[in-house]
Amino acid sequence: MRMWKAVAAAVFGVALALEGADISMAAQQPDVYGRVEHGYATSEGGVKIHYAWLGPKQSAGTPLVILIHGFPDFWYSWRDQMAALSDRFQMVAIDQRGYNLSDKPKGVESYDGRLLVADVAAVIKHLGRAKATIVGHDWGGAVAWQFAMFLPQMTENLIILNLPHPSGFLRELRSNKDQIANSEYARTFQTKSASDPTVFFGKPMTPETLSSWVRDPMARKRYIEAFQRSDFEAMLNYYKRNYPASGPDAPPPAPLPKVKMPVLVFHGLADTALNADGLSGTWNWLEKDLTLVTVPGAGHFVQQDASEMVTTTMRWWLTARTTK
């Protein structure tokens, strides 16, 4: 649990402000919503995990990329990356448990980090693969860091978006006053229920408030529909189960194993929940190369705010590290 909390400490919910969202990539690419194929994998305890995929037909020779969303989100967060990269890679975006078309088990314990990692492993095995490139944003980033650390044999490469290495973030969470203040929303999520009318930054949790950050009107409509199928209490259970204490009196994190595969990190510098200071020293916790891309003007949802930069960089980086 302490190891997972070290990873989960670096997770963030929604950015309070999004500036200059770039939807040009979405405009250039055919929308994937009606083009993807859907499937379900069975995880521990019989929990069904939904995934959407696009790309070459499944085969051992096609590089597999698993995409893991954060809060509040669903598989469609990766629409631009799926559309642009599916010519070369099998792009598989999951709905994390509690969201959209995946199962929504009851109880805080059902959202323990170990189970979230098991969900990703279940999808890879269901697809008949031994390993994949793991991509994660926000809570998906926490799961991705954890997956890479403890299932390195299943991790080809690691791509993280707006989520520092847990050791870097915990350092800031214990000593950086700005970061501590920026993380106060997580305490609200831990102490209130989804039915509280002020739980979501002073507003109720509704499909409309949860999707208010989405700029594209058609995408927002699909987010509202996905959140109508989601469990709001389950969303908060991620925080209740896994988010650790902050401040100088917080217990130090347990040691974490070094990440053994190449890592690509994107960070939108306008993220109002996450200080970029947490990125410092990332290289100390990795065994292989780190590529760090900071994006001025992009916020927490960097894969959408700067989708063209993210997608172009992913293609270059993955092509250099994968073979057909």
Residue ranges and their predicted role:
Residues 298-307, 311:
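Catalytic histidine-centered segment of alpha/beta-hydrolase-like enzymes
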Residues 20, 24-27:
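Boundary at the C-terminal end of the N-terminal hydrophobic targeting segment
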Residues 28-39, 47-49, 54-59, 64, ...:
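Flexible "cap/lid" subdomain of the alpha/beta-hydrolase fold that forms the substrate-access gate
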Residues 81-89, 126:
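A short, Lys/Arg-enriched amphipathic alpha-helix followed by its capping loop at the start of a domain
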Residues 8-19:
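Bacterial N-terminal signal peptides
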Residues 67-70, 93:
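Structural cue for short, hydrophobic secondary-structure segments
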Residues 72-80, 91:
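Serine-hydrolase catalytic-loop signature spanning alpha/beta hydrolases and amidase-signature enzymes
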